[in-house]
Design a protein with these regions (language model features):
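Flexible, solvent-exposed loop/hinge segments and secondary-structure transition points
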Residues: 1-142
């Protein structure tokens, strides 16, 4: 039998606080989602000016990163003409290959994911990394 850990609401909010601060520093109106280890949202924030359409995209990025245990941009083989093209039609269309979804690992185990939608791929990545870094610092202090 396996025991799985997942992010708590407090940890999700810690991640989102740091990600939001980074998004605001970049001047990007992001939608941010932290999911549990099963890909379901624990916490979601739509920053002022964040696009309504980015809400579902952020949730899908978090789902993909948590459930498939890889950053969403690692699925380039799902683009047209590639081996895994069409995988995005699975899981009710929730699988996504857009940049900006990252698994959150603790001691090598995926405990959840963070995703950002609303900026460029580079901005989304920076915002997510700020959230992950905040959790790492927090856990290091325990």
């Amino acid at each position: 039998m396996h025991t799985y850990q997942t992010l708590t609401l407090a940890e999700a909010n810690l991640i989102l606080d740091a990600a939001q601060a980074k998004a605001e520093a970049l001047g990007v109106p992001e939608v941010l989602c932290v999911a549990d280890n099963a890909g379901y949202p624990v916490a979601l924030r739509r920053l002022d000016g964040g696009k309504v359409t980015s809400v579902q995209i952020a949730m899908n990025k978090a789902f993909t990163a948590a459930c498939h245990r890889k950053p969403t941009h690692m699925y380039k083989n799902a683009l047209p003409g590639e081996e895994a093209f069409g995988i995005f039609t699975q899981h009710e269309g929730r699988f996504t290959v857009f940049v900006g979804g990252f698994p959150v690992l603790v001691e090598g185990q995926v405990v959840g994911a963070i995703a950002a939608s609303g900026g460029s791929g580079e901005q989304d990545t920076e915002v997510c990394q700020a959230g992950i870094d905040a959790l790492v610092r927090h856990l290091g202090k325990k």
